[in-house]
Amino acid sequence: MNRRKLMASLAVIPAIGLATPVFAQEEPLKVGFIYVGPVGDGGWTYQHDLGRQAIEEEFGDRVETTFIESVPEGADAERALSQLALAGNELIFATSFGFMDPVINVAAKFPDVKFEHATGYKRAENVATYDARFYEGRAVMGTIAGRMTESNKIGYIGSFPIPEVIQGINSSFIHARKVNPDVEMKVVWAYSWFDPAKEADAASALIAEGVDVILQHTDSTAPLAKAQEAGAIGFGQASDMSNFAPSPRVSSIIDNWAPYYIERVGQVLDGTWESKGTWAGIAGGEVEIGEITEAVPAEVKEEALALKDSIASGEYHPFTGPLNRQDGSEWLAEGQVATDEELSGMNFFVEGITAKIPE
Amino acid sequence: MIDPLSVFLLLLSASTPIVFAALGELVTERAGVLNLGVEGMMIVGALAGFAAAHATGSPFIGFVVAALAGAAVSMTFAMLTQFLLANQVASGLALTLFGLGLAALFGKPLEGIKAPAMVPGPLRINWIVWLGIAMVPLIWWFLNRSRAGLILRGVGENHDAAHALGYPVRIVRITAIGFGGAMAGVGGAFLSIAIVLQWTEGMTAGAGWIALAIVVFSNWTALGVLAGAWLFGGVTVLQLRLQAAGVAVPVQFLSMAPYLATIIVLVLISAQQKYSRRSGRAAPGSLGQNFYALR
């Protein structure tokens, strides 16, 4: 459907060029998206597509959206982005970290097109970045994980060793340890955002190591299916994944991109859009905590929700000292809070995690 | 310490989709047809098998339906290449794209649904895994010891000669393509019904391409396919286990290990072939060439 739409919009370009604008009919604003996975992944890409649908609902005929799904990170992304820019999209959302350099390259070639890049840190005159503080949600998941594990081993399926993922691993671990000093964390890198078979194998490997709570930073529901088979528990990632509730999915981190997307499209429509970096979290509504199910004891649920509330109110920051780096050197002193710069470049594990970050 | 038996059991199931798909492709290629649509046939099998298993509650019926569905989509390829004499490489790629799109389209309502539970076979291993292993000697026997297998190989080695001897080249090839489709379908269904336990769009994630590479790796022998699939699956599983166990080996090395191992063996095989050429062990002579009877 998306490809066909794209073809149709490509075919329309010459027609627009030739037609003299006798009728002052306003052309709809064209908004394009590239996704790293299929919209049916039930996780990360699915949530971005919900955001796209929210734009259509909000603005109706004033916007026209297109998307290209399953775009590999790397050179192919440049082709997809150029394609969208050539098709007349004035605002393009690139929704994965690995699209960062392609976005910067293509944006330089199309100075009139505005680009929005998710989870990256490179900006330009016409490139804005946006991200969500997933680590806030991870703190809540870590608390539940630390309380729920019986083997005192929790597992984490990482995608790529980039700051966003490392923040999540650290945040989960810090908060699991806080409620359960005996907890250990095993980390497996899948080197993919979306590969259900590999994610399932990674979950099996963790379970074979004695892990009974699995956290994931990959996009499919395969690890949850594996957890269920083995009697372990896990969490919804990016999307609610409520099909697996009440167990193995005991809670979830939900990315809600709709408010940001609507805001930015609105700004393009009224001409106030400018390049900036946005990083909202639980307080801004971009990170939501999915329902904590009855598989979790009431007091643990209460504790988790209390943590969530204190993060939302700004009273507590998940990275508050005293915290040491993995090698034992001091990172944050008592009461000191990590800065956004430190977090967005985070490339180390905190003390207590035995796994090494691939370098 | 990592228990070798548990790694082996994980490897058995992780490599099964590739074992099926590669064995099917082996037979197809031995008949002289290069079908690059394995990925497409696998994903159609994954979807059809999952849908049938979900609808009937019986994983067994799911696998049967997956085989039928895989064979059915492979017939579009057979039609293009055997009757319309279209280029096999292009048609195969088209079949992959077609299969991925078709499955994505019809798979929408099945997203998020869980697969019915399977009754495990011996050693708490899925019956389909054992079936995949059993297919290896069966296919070896068929190719090397049966008359039908000899004809199939003859068609693959030199279709003009086979035609001159009166063998129905086209029918043999269509049958082989159908068999390859059915096997790829079962492999795909194993992924959705037994490994991932649900349907997800794009879930084959390149397994079909690995199966194609393993056929080359195997030097077109059934035992080689099993060895290749186990090597690839084994290293994949092992690297994940090593990571989970926190063994201090650089993760990048572990991640590339399956591919690296495959490349090394390919180099060894081609070196060995260069120095000791043995008949009937390299690529089939008519592989990838279309056949039409001049008279």
Annotate the PLM regions.
Chain A
Residues 1-11:
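N-terminal secretory signal peptides and thylakoid transit peptides that target proteins
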Residues 19-21:
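N-terminal signal peptide c-region/cleavage motif recognized by signal peptidases
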Residues 24-359:
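A residue-level marker of the well-folded mature domains of exported/periplasmic proteins
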